[in-house]
From Swiss-Prot:
One of its GO terms (cellular component) is tRNA methyltransferase complex. Pfam families: Methyltransf_4 (PF02390). PANTHER family: 3-DEOXY-D-MANNO-OCTULOSONIC-ACID TRANSFERASE/TRNA GUANINE-N 7 - -METHYLTRANSFERASE, PENTACOTRIPEPTIDE-REPEAT REGION OF PRORP DOMAIN-CONTAINING PROTEIN. It is an enzyme of class 2 (transferase). This is tRNA (guanine-N(7)-)-methyltransferase. Residues 16-26 have a biased composition (Polar residues). It comes from Ralstonia pickettii (strain 12J). Belongs to the class I-like SAM-binding methyltransferase superfamily. TrmB family.
Length: 257
């Protein structure tokens, strides 16, 4: 089945009606045709890469973008250091949140996965402007990156911020945060590693909480929804939504061990 063409926005451009590229097509759910679907971490969306974004890709891509391969990633070689915590982000939108967190946590290494070229260019532009050295980018389906490049039990954290809510009920099965995929994510965490999801779609927030709570290898860090961790910034679109009375929910679980 081909990826569904649908516009969207990332964690730096969020409303309940318009979210980022993350989605899921679950083999357990099945397609409308009756055939099983594989999990896919994105939808294609239209968007023009600006001159500045393209320049950043051309000039900074060779240093900060990593090719997708079917071999395990050598983090130490990719980041030029050893011993840093390893954080994996699925779908970083236009990259403002990723850049902010990486600056706030310079001792951690961040691998962001995003297929939307304008978003990749935007994050590379921020990397150059702010002289950020602890981010690397892979432009590929995050599900395949996780399966092929990230060995199990090697991640200190996973971020999934504002995935597509697929708010129509008949599309709910396309959501990324479902039990089979969460089990995969948990398998790639180290004991004590965390999985942090955030959404501004309340019904999806409750689904996230239910799904993560049902994963036996994970435990909640809070009684229900978590307070927003200090490292996750409030974006301008989130502020606008909060002024309009829209909520934002964070769910943070840790790997038992």
């Amino acid at each position: 089945m081909q990826p569904i063409e649908q516009p969207g926005t990332g964690p730096d451009d969020i409303t309940p009606e318009s979210q980022d590229t993350n989605t899921a097509e679950s083999a357990e759910s099945g397609a409308e045709t009756g055939h099983p679907r594989r999990i896919r971490s994105f939808v294609r969306r239209a968007g023009r890469t600006s001159t500045g974004q393209q320049r950043a890709i051309n000039e900074l891509g060779p240093r900060f973008q990593l090719p997708y391969t079917t071999e395990p990633l050598d983090w130490d070689a990719a980041f030029g250091r050893a011993g840093a915590k390893r954080i994996f982000e699925i779908g970083f939108g236009m990259g403002e949140t990723t850049a902010h967190i990486a600056q706030l946590r310079p001792d951690d290494d961040f691998l962001g996965v995003e297929v939307h070229e304008p978003g990749v260019g935007a994050l590379l532009k921020l990397i150059g402007e702010r002289e950020i050295g602890n981010i690397r980018i892979v432009s590929h389906d995050a599900v395949e990156v996780l399966a092929q490049m990230i060995p199990e039990g090697t991640l200190d954290g996973i971020h999934v911020f504002f995935p597509d809510p697929w708010h129509k009920k008949r599309h709910n099965k396309r959501r990324l945060i479902q039990s089979p995929f969460v089990a995969r994510l948990a398998a790639h965490l180290k004991p004590g590693g965390y999985l942090h999801c955030a959404t501004d779609w309340e019904e999806y927030a409750h689904q996230m909480l239910e799904v993560l709570s049902s994963e036996p290898t994970l435990e909640n860090t809070a009684d229900g929804f978590a307070p927003r961790p200090d490292y996750r910034p409030v974006t301008k679109f989130e502020k606008r939504g909060l002024r309009l009375g829209h909520g934002v929910w964070d769910v943070v679980f840790r790997k038992r061990g």
